[in-house]
Amino acid sequence: MSNIRIGKSSVRLTDDDYAGYMLLNTILGGYFGSRLMSNIREEKGYTYGIGSFNVSLPQRSYWSITTEVNNEYTEATIEEIFKEIHKLRTETVPAEELNLVKNYLYGDLLRELDGVFAQSDSLKHKLNYGLDNSFYIGIIEKIRQCTPEAILELADKYWNPEEMYIVTAGQP
């Protein structure tokens, strides 16, 4: 087995591009119906799971793609990952896909506030980052306003493959 990690520094929670970046990341690998899951798991059968995520920290943030594959699929998997990134940097996301992911994120944001433990995590998050109660409303509004062209611009702005680190570990 090979573990594959691809990543780079990323937008922070308080950056203006954060909501759009969250949407972009979800399209690529942030949920089960993402492009990476559809391609690398469903179509190619290289892995049981692949995903991408953004980790926001107070001083710096990072973005990562993670998966495990059989050794013989390592290079092909990396190639497919970069094909999907290239598509997002060069082609607009279809409106139907964008709306599906927006609705997914709306539900995901609501789940972050559902229940006492989720609300306490949200409060901790707001305190750590100096956010006020309007933060979530602002995120939802920015997601709502995001267009296919904006997603294309964000992908081109933040996902230059030459700025990404690729790490693999496992048997050669």
Each model region followed by its residue ranges:
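His/Glu-based metal-binding/catalytic segments typifying zinc-dependent metallopeptidases
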Residues: 1-35
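Short, conserved catalytic/metal-binding micro-motifs enriched in Asp/Glu and His
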Residues: 22, 151, 166
